[in-house]
């Protein structure tokens, strides 16, 4: 069984190890109320300047519905990354539906800060 072909526009795509780490952090962020689910809410966090980083699903159909986010991220200097599955992203966000984009938000005194910073660096390495 081969993995389905991923749209080349979904760049940078996280590998299996980074995806697992990302989804774990997304799950923790949901518990700490530091998560915004959905493309529209992710856009709002970017515009308000409260996004730590953005995670998008590479299998969003059509992909163009989330491709405004990387442009906005680059304007705001926010790291962004794609994971393969919207189903997995939805589960990590703690909802029963697929999620095509989510934003981990800034929170003062958050216990997730060290993990968030190390993931931001990993994502930025992908973008180079």
Swiss-Prot record:
BP-aspect Gene Ontology terms: mRNA splicing, via spliceosome; ribosomal small subunit biogenesis
Stretch forming the signal peptide: none
GO molecular function terms listed in the Swiss-Prot or TrEMBL record: U4atac snRNA binding
Keywords assigned by UniProt, alphabetized: mRNA processing, mRNA splicing, Nucleus, Ribonucleoprotein, RNA-binding, Spliceosome
Chief location: nucleus
Lyase among keywords: no
Any matching Pfam family: Ribosomal_L7Ae
Keyword RNA-binding among UniProt keywords: yes
A cellular component term, taken from the record's GO annotations: small-subunit processome
Cell compartment(s), UniProt: Nucleus; Nucleus, Nucleolus
Record site: Interaction with U4 snRNA and U4atac snRNA: 61, 86
Region described as Interaction with U4 snRNA and U4atac snRNA: 36-48
Region annotated Important for U4 snRNA-binding, chain positions: 96-128
Family: Belongs to the eukaryotic ribosomal protein eL8 family.
Function: Part of the small subunit (SSU) processome, first precursor of the small eukaryotic ribosomal subunit. During the assembly of the SSU processome in the nucleolus, many ribosome biogenesis factors, an RNA chaperone and ribosomal proteins associate with the nascent pre-rRNA and work in concert to generate RNA folding, modifications, rearrangements and cleavage as well as targeted degradation of pre-ribosomal RNA by the RNA exosome. Involved in pre-mRNA splicing as component of the spliceosome. Binds to the 5'-stem-loop of U4 snRNA and thereby contributes to spliceosome assembly.
The protein's assembly and partners: Identified in the spliceosome B complex. Component of the U4/U6-U5 tri-snRNP complex. Part of the small subunit (SSU) processome, composed of more than 70 proteins and the RNA chaperone small nucleolar RNA (snoRNA) U3.
Designated name of the protein: NHP2-like protein 1
Lineage: Eukaryota, Metazoa, Chordata, Craniata, Vertebrata
